[in-house]
């Protein structure tokens, strides 16, 4: 099968070592319907000897049944795997294939050419270094050509190969090639593609001309074959080595003596002893060690998954970003972005969504559409909603600030996805364009315009603001415990208030369903209120089922890890059913937490109170002790 089969049979370890050192190039193929994308990939695999013999025999048989190439083997069948694709002779979903040569490793994304699958193309392009845009020599630059070129430009793909395919049907006429090249260059100038990043290749994917080997049928073409371009295009310089960005994926605490922050370095280089700050908090420290499974490193670069330990015990949580102290990104809760809408349900300005950028997960909304972009004509038009496959420049507003870069500067920290809060489906993909300069360094809406500082409020109330979430099954005793803690704190002269999940369903959260998604949304909406109470200096006590671990993590990002305390109020389902304070179990409802739908036990809870084993008074004492430990009271 492989060009290196001899080395594999002689010395497998040498082969694996050589293979590991190869540079990886991710590229995608796109173009109009039936331009030959899947055939091109099949040809690349076939001519680079990356097809197993039994696989080749299988597609030879299939070619006679569903092939479109007459007596020839239909190499497109190597990639068109869905039954609907083979029946219709088109590509519907993004198909990924892997192959390698002596010089490089490759991952190919074969993207669909139809307009209704623009979102699939955007998905395939998001991680690619290079795009191959196929043009049928018979038709020249088409609407889909312009659309895919615009999306490739939008998604920051820096290298584009314009493959003018089916030149055999035009007898490899140089005039046809030059005319299509001129037409494409005129369009490329409009969308800002640099001519230095463009390569034009006349080819026949079906016959193999100029795909892997140079063709004798185009003696006038002095350039490289497609494979030569793929093997030699310079992508190492595309990596950002200047701006150190380390999104924290999780806090690694295997034992009491180790606390590290795990993640993948998005860009830049980090070394032992580097001064870093955690954003958005702005707290600083130095890198103590860079830990991997194989041992410690002196430095790490883009794409490496490592665990960083710091000299100081500063508060760093999932979603935070570690950066060099002298090279900080913007910290803001608002920015402009180019957004590709990927859902059947239209995007409505002002609707609440979850915005996921790298490891941060923050509630937010899209207040307005600046303009929609017609990807066929590049015309800008106003809009009040965004439909499936439409692209627009929008304004994004977050409920909590995050650290971010522009997409051109950093494709990881400058990109985000939009998630529907009820279905958890990805509905949009965005590229950050800019952020308001005034937002730099902001940490919340409440700040520069406030006349009363947080310190003054803390001094007046004699406490530090905090939110305590009492989470557990229905009937576990959450509300009972929350109100008892409120009574005790109030008698101590503290400013405190209970936000009860059931009470809020009569007003703020009226109409929300009682299922898992509805109960998660019930808590997330209230988390905004709790945050505002904290801004006012109060202690918020929240009694909610909050069944979703993901929803609780989102609330932590919103309120702040240093302010949110999670108390798991524990009781067995049988005891909860016997207590049944709201009559939920007796009514035979089909929305019972832990029975009708899963309840994610808070494994990382700050405190666990077993209401079967402890009295209310004992539970109150444990909560107060924890508040004192956190220096809230």
Curated annotation (Swiss-Prot):
Residues 22-241 form the tr-type G domain. CDD domains: APSK, CysN_ATPS, CysN_NodQ_II, CysN_NoDQ_III. It comes from Pseudomonas aeruginosa (strain ATCC 15692 / DSM 22644 / CIP 104116 / JCM 14847 / LMG 12228 / 1C / PRS 101 / PAO1). Its EC number is 2.7.7.4, 2.7.1.25. Residues 110-113 are annotated as: G3. SUPFAM superfamilies: EF-Tu/eEF-1alpha/eIF2-gamma C-terminal domain, P-loop containing nucleoside triphosphate hydrolases, Translation proteins. Residues 1-463 are annotated as: Sulfate adenylyltransferase. One of its GO terms (biological process) is sulfur compound metabolic process. In the C-terminal section; belongs to the APS kinase family. In the N-terminal section; belongs to the TRAFAC class translation factor GTPase superfamily. Classic translation factor GTPase family. CysN/NodQ subfamily. It holds the Pfam family APS_kinase. ATP binds at residues 472-479. This is Bifunctional enzyme CysN/CysC.
């Amino acid at each position: 099968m492989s060009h290196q089969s001899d080395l594999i049979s002689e010395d497998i370890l040498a082969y694996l070592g050589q293979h590991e050192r190869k540079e990886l190039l991710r590229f995608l193929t796109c173009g109009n319907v039936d331009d030959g994308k899947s055939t091109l990939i099949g040809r690349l695999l076939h001519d680079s000897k990356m097809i197993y013999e039994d696989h080749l025999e299988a597609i030879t048989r299939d070619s006679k049944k569903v092939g479109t190439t007459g007596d020839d083997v239909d190499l497109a069948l190597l990639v068109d795997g869905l039954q609907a694709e083979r029946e219709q002779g088109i590509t519907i979903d993004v198909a990924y294939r892997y192959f390698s040569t002596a010089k490089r490793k490759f991952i190919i994304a074969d993207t669909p050419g139809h307009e209704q699958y623009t979102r699939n193309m955007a998905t395939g392009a998001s991680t690619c270094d290079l795009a191959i845009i196929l043009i049928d020599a018979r038709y020249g630059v088409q609407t889909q050509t312009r659309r895919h070129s615009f999306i490739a430009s939008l998604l920051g793909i820096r290298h584009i190969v314009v493959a003018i395919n089916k030149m055999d049907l035009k007898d490899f006429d140089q005039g046809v090639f030059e005319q299509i090249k001129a037409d494409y260059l005129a369009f490329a100038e409009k969308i800002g593609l640099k001519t230095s990043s463009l390569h034009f290749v006349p080819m026949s994917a079906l016959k193999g001309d100029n795909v892997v080997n140079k063709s004798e049928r185009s003696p006038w073409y002095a350039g490289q074959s497609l494979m030569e371009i793929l093997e030699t295009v310079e992508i190492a310089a595309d990596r950002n080595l200047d701006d150190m960005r380390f999104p924290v994926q999780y806090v690694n605490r295997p034992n009491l003596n180790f606390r590290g922050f795990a993640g993948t370095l998005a860009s830049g280089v980090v070394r032992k002893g580097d001064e870093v700050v955690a954003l958005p908090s702005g707290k600083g420290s130095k890198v103590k060690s860079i830990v991997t499974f194989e041992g410690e490193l002196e430095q790490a670069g883009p794409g490496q998954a490592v665990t960083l330990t710091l000299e100081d015990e500063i508060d760093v949580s999932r979603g935070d970003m570690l950066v060099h102290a002298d090279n900080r990104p913007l910290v803001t809760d608002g920015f402009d972005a180019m957004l590709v809408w990927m859902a059947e349900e239209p995007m409505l300005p002002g609707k609440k969504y979850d915005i996921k950028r790298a490891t941060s997960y923050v509630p937010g909304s899209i207040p307005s559409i600046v303009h929609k972009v017609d990807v066929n004509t590049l015309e800008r038009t106003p809009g009040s909603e965004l439909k499936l496959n439409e692209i627009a420049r929008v304004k994004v507003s977050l409920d909590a600030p995050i650290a971010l870069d522009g997409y051109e500067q950093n494709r990881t920290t400058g990109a985000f996805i939009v998630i529907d809060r009820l279905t958890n489906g990805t509905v949009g993909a965005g590229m950050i364009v800019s952020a308001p300069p005034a937002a730099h360094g902001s940490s919340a809406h409440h700040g520069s315009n406030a006349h009363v500082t947080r310190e003054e409020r803390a001094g007046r109330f004699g406490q530090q603001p905090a939110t305590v979430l009492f989470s557990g099954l229905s009937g576990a005793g959450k509300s009972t415990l929350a109100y008892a803690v409120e009574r005790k704190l109030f008698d101590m002269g503290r400013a405190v208030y209970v936000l009860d999940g059931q009470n809020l369903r009569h007003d703020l959260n009226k109409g929300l369903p009682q299922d898992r998604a509805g109960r998660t949304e019930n808590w997330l909406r209230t988390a905004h209120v709790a945050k505002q109470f904290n801004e006012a200096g109060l202690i918020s006590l929240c009694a909610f089922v909050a069944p979703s671990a993901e929803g609780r993590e989102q609330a932590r990002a919103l309120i702040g890890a240093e302010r949110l305390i999670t108390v798991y109020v524990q009781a067995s389902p049988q005891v909860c059913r016997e207590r049944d304070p709201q009559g939920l179990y007796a009514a035979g409802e089909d929305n019972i937490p832990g029975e009708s739908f899963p309840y994610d036990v808070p494994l990382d809870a700050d405190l666990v109170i077993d209401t079967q084993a402890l009295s209310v008074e004992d539970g109150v004492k444990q909560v107060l002790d924890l508040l004192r430990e956190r220096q809230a009271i």
